[in-house]
Regions:
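Short, glycine/charged-enriched hinge/interface segments at domain edges or termini
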Residues: 1-69
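Short glycine/threonine-rich loop/turn motifs
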Residues: 42, 48, 52, 66-178
Length: 178
C-alpha cells in the first residue's frame, strides 16, 4: 500500500518480485445473464404475507444486466424447494437464487434442499455482516446457486452484493475467496 505520493524504487521492485508472474490487476467483463428465483416460505406461498423480497432482488439483478426469467414460490418443505430447484435446472438459466429458509429455524430447509438438488456447496455461512447465513454452491455444469438470507432484502450491501459481480463476470468463487 502506497500512502505518500512517492515510493522508493526498491520498495516498488520488491512488490513486483513478490507478485511474480501473477497480474496485479485483471478485468473480467460482466456477461448478460438470466436468473431463476425460488421464493420459499409457507406464509408467502399461502398468500398470508406479500413477497417483498423478489422486487428488491430484481432491482439488484437488473443493476448487473441480469434478467429474472423464472420465478417459483413454494412452501418451506425440503422436497418442495428441491423440486423447484430441479425444475429451474431444466430451464438452462445462468444462476438460481433461493430466498427464505436460510436461518437455523427447524423449518428452514433451503440449505438442505440445495444440497439435495445435487449442488456442490462452496459455503453455507460467510464471515460477513450482513449476510452470515449466505450459501453458495455450483452444479457440475458450473451453474451457480445461492441461498440468500433475509438481510439481502433490507441492507444496501451484503455478502450477496460482493459475490454477484464475480458471478456475473464468470469468475468462480471459492471458499477461500469468501
Amino acid at each position: 500500500r502506497v500512502i505518500p505520493l512517492i515510493i522508493a524504487d526498491e520498495k516498488l521492485r520488491e512488490a513486483e518480485r513478490i507478485a511474480g508472474d501473477t497480474p496485479i490487476l485483471s478485468l473480467h467483463p460482466y456477461v448478460r445473464k438470466t436468473a431463476g428465483v425460488i421464493t420459499t416460505g409457507s406464509e408467502v406461498a399461502s398468500g398470508r404475507i406479500q413477497d417483498t423480497f423478489t422486487p428488491i432482488l430484481q432491482k439488484k439483478l437488473a443493476a448487473y444486466g441480469i434478467e429474472m426469467t423464472e420465478h417459483r414460490t413454494v412452501g418451506d418443505g425440503l422436497d418442495a424447494v428441491a423440486s423447484a430447484t430441479a425444475e429451474l435446472r431444466t430451464k438452462k438459466l445462468d444462476m438460481i437464487l433461493c430466498t427464505g429458509g436460510m436461518s437455523v429455524d427447524p423449518d428452514d430447509n433451503t440449505p438442505g434442499a440445495i444440497k439435495q438438488s445435487g449442488a456442490h456447496i462452496v459455503t453455507y455461512g460467510a464471515p460477513v455482516l450482513p449476510g452470515a447465513m449466505f450459501l453458495l454452491g455450483y452444479f457440475d455444469d458450473g451453474q451457480p446457486i445461492m441461498g440468500l438470507p433475509g438481510c439481502v432484502m433490507y441492507a444496501k450491501a451484503t455478502i450477496f452484493d460482493l459475490i454477484l459481480p464475480r458471478v456475473t463476470a464468470n469468475v468462480p468463487v471459492t471458499k477461500r475467496d469468501i
